[in-house]
Amino acid sequence: MPSAKQRGSKGGHGAASPSEKGAHPSGGADDVAKKPPPAPQQPPPPPAPHPQQHPQQHPQNQAHGKGGHRGGGGGGGKSSSSSSASAAAAAAAASSSASCSRRLGRALNFLFYLALVAAAAFSGWCVHHVLEEVQQVRRSHQDFSRQREELGQGLQGVEQKVQSLQATFGTFESILRSSQHKQDLTEKAVKQGESEVSRISEVLQKLQNEILKDLSDGIHVVKDARERDFTSLENTVEERLTELTKSINDNIAIFTEVQKRSQKEINDMKAKVASLEESEGNKQDLKALKEAVKEIQTSAKSREWDMEALRSTLQTMESDIYTEVRELVSLKQEQQAFKEAADTERLALQALTEKLLRSEESVSRLPEEIRRLEEELRQLKSDSHGPKEDGGFRHSEAFEALQQKSQGLDSRLQHVEDGVLSMQVASARQTESLESLLSKSQEHEQRLAALQGRLEGLGSSEADQDGLASTVRSLGETQLVLYGDVEELKRSVGELPSTVESLQKVQEQVHTLLSQDQAQAARLPPQDFLDRLSSLDNLKASVSQVEADLKMLRTAVDSLVAYSVKIETNENNLESAKGLLDDLRNDLDRLFVKVEKIHEKV
């Protein structure tokens, strides 16, 4: 505020100086014209600048005073100019004071708004800080509630364990009560046995006394009888002796029976006493059990960890077993596909054998046709040696017949060539299929070896093992059947060389006939015979190719036989793996039983 007052005073003196120096009054009007219009919404200036107007009035008064002096000195003409200058100076002073007040109001408004913004920012920061603290309190409260829930769950588990321990102690107390009751019963039985033993001893004592009395009475009677009659004495002595012996025997029998009964009761008592000793041992066992329960409570946590580890291992073992079962199923499917491929190959071999039989039949018919050709050639020779008159006509007829026969032979040879070509194609297909079968068999061997290595440590279900064994056996049976078919094919191939030899003989005969009948062959078109010879050569080459293909088939069959032997070894390995799986299953059952016992103890 003092600075504002100083600024106002400086502005007042500055505005009054032109009037004192005699400045032109138009300067104030120009300044007033150059000033911008006031803002429409400018707030009213604060009342603080009002004291600044008092120092501004002094220059005006001074100006008026000076003007008065000047006017008084200069005359009436100068008084009007001085009044206008004073009015201009007053307007300039008023405009400068208004601009200063406006600037000061703007600065104060800016400071006020800046303070409001700072207060709002500070309040927002405080609210944000308070919200973060509230969130932290909520989080801590949630953590505390979670800890309370966990503690509640732990307390519930402890309560359950305490209840189970109470139940076990209740059972132990019931067992103790039953053992005490049995002990009371045994004590009562011991007392009863002692009373019976005392009663038996009393009875025996009475019997002894009675016997002694009888003996003493008998002795007295004998003494009296001696005096009376010796004969009657003997009779009475004998009677009394017999009676005494009977009574003694009866008493001895009774005594033995009583002794046996007493011995049985004593044995029963001994057994009961032993059971009582066992009950005392049970007390000691109960104490040991209490200590063991405490130890179990202390080691329960470690056992829980062990149980979790066992569960995890069992789950991993189950997952591995499931994967192995899936692999076994896939292997079973592949073996079924292999079986189907073997069946198809068997059918192809059967078709090939049928084609071979047909070719053999056609080849077996060739010698007859060649014989017919020889006969026709002989007839042609005989016709050629006949009279020359009918030679042209007969020659033409023979030539036509020979052409017809050659055409028939060509058709038959073409049929044979077609059969041989089909046999070649079938043999090529057979070799390709056998190669594919060999590759598949090698893959199966590798997979079986890998599966056997895995099955040494893991187990699978008996149904899958039985199914795998059955599939392997069926595959072995199909391979045996295929082996039989291939053996038949070998036999048929073994018969092929004889047919080739017969074809060679026929070819030689044809060559000889052609050499003998060169003149007749010169008349006939030789190109047909050359074609026939070339067809026979082609037939021979095709037959040799068939022999080579059949040799390849033999090697493939031998490899299949070796593969069947490998399959038998794989079956044996699978049986051994099955035994290992049974052992593993038994070990797993024992492990489960141990785990259940641990659960029961816990």
Swiss-Prot record:
<dbReference type="GO" id="GO:0005811">
    <property type="term" value="C:lipid droplet"/>
</dbReference>
<feature type="transmembrane region" description="Helical">
    <location>
        <begin position="107"/>
        <end position="127"/>
    </location>
</feature>
<dbReference type="GO" id="GO:0003723">
    <property type="term" value="F:RNA binding"/>
</dbReference>
<feature type="modified residue" description="N6-acetyllysine">
    <location>
        <position position="21"/>
    </location>
</feature>
<comment type="function">
    <text>High-affinity epithelial cell surface receptor for the FZD8-related low molecular weight sialoglycopeptide APF/antiproliferative factor. Mediates the APF antiproliferative signaling within cells.</text>
</comment>
<feature type="modified residue" description="Phosphoserine; by FAM20C">
    <location>
        <position position="232"/>
    </location>
</feature>
<feature type="coiled-coil region">
    <location>
        <begin position="533"/>
        <end position="602"/>
    </location>
</feature>
<keyword id="KW-0735">Signal-anchor</keyword>
<dbReference type="GO" id="GO:0035577">
    <property type="term" value="C:azurophil granule membrane"/>
</dbReference>
<dbReference type="GO" id="GO:0005791">
    <property type="term" value="C:rough endoplasmic reticulum"/>
</dbReference>
<keyword id="KW-0564">Palmitate</keyword>
<keyword id="KW-0812">Transmembrane</keyword>
<keyword id="KW-0597">Phosphoprotein</keyword>
<keyword id="KW-0472">Membrane</keyword>
<keyword id="KW-0206">Cytoskeleton</keyword>
<dbReference type="GO" id="GO:0005886">
    <property type="term" value="C:plasma membrane"/>
</dbReference>
<feature type="topological domain" description="Extracellular">
    <location>
        <begin position="128"/>
        <end position="602"/>
    </location>
</feature>
<keyword id="KW-0256">Endoplasmic reticulum</keyword>
<keyword id="KW-0007">Acetylation</keyword>
<feature type="compositionally biased region" description="Pro residues">
    <location>
        <begin position="35"/>
        <end position="52"/>
    </location>
</feature>
<feature type="lipid moiety-binding region" description="S-palmitoyl cysteine; by ZDHHC2">
    <location>
        <position position="100"/>
    </location>
</feature>
<dbReference type="GO" id="GO:0016020">
    <property type="term" value="C:membrane"/>
</dbReference>
<feature type="modified residue" description="Phosphoserine">
    <location>
        <position position="312"/>
    </location>
</feature>
<protein>
    <recommendedName>
        <fullName>Cytoskeleton-associated protein 4</fullName>
    </recommendedName>
</protein>
<comment type="function">
    <text>Mediates the anchoring of the endoplasmic reticulum to microtubules.</text>
</comment>
<keyword id="KW-0963">Cytoplasm</keyword>
<dbReference type="GO" id="GO:0070062">
    <property type="term" value="C:extracellular exosome"/>
</dbReference>
<dbReference type="GO" id="GO:0035579">
    <property type="term" value="C:specific granule membrane"/>
</dbReference>
<dbReference type="GO" id="GO:0005788">
    <property type="term" value="C:endoplasmic reticulum lumen"/>
</dbReference>
<dbReference type="GO" id="GO:0005739">
    <property type="term" value="C:mitochondrion"/>
</dbReference>
<dbReference type="GO" id="GO:0042599">
    <property type="term" value="C:lamellar body"/>
</dbReference>
<feature type="modified residue" description="Phosphoserine">
    <location>
        <position position="19"/>
    </location>
</feature>
<feature type="modified residue" description="Phosphoserine">
    <location>
        <position position="3"/>
    </location>
</feature>
<dbReference type="GO" id="GO:0016607">
    <property type="term" value="C:nuclear speck"/>
</dbReference>
<keyword id="KW-0449">Lipoprotein</keyword>
<dbReference type="GO" id="GO:0005789">
    <property type="term" value="C:endoplasmic reticulum membrane"/>
</dbReference>
<feature type="coiled-coil region">
    <location>
        <begin position="256"/>
        <end position="460"/>
    </location>
</feature>
<keyword id="KW-1003">Cell membrane</keyword>
<feature type="region of interest" description="Disordered">
    <location>
        <begin position="1"/>
        <end position="83"/>
    </location>
</feature>
<keyword id="KW-0175">Coiled coil</keyword>
<dbReference type="GO" id="GO:0048471">
    <property type="term" value="C:perinuclear region of cytoplasm"/>
</dbReference>
<dbReference type="GO" id="GO:0005856">
    <property type="term" value="C:cytoskeleton"/>
</dbReference>
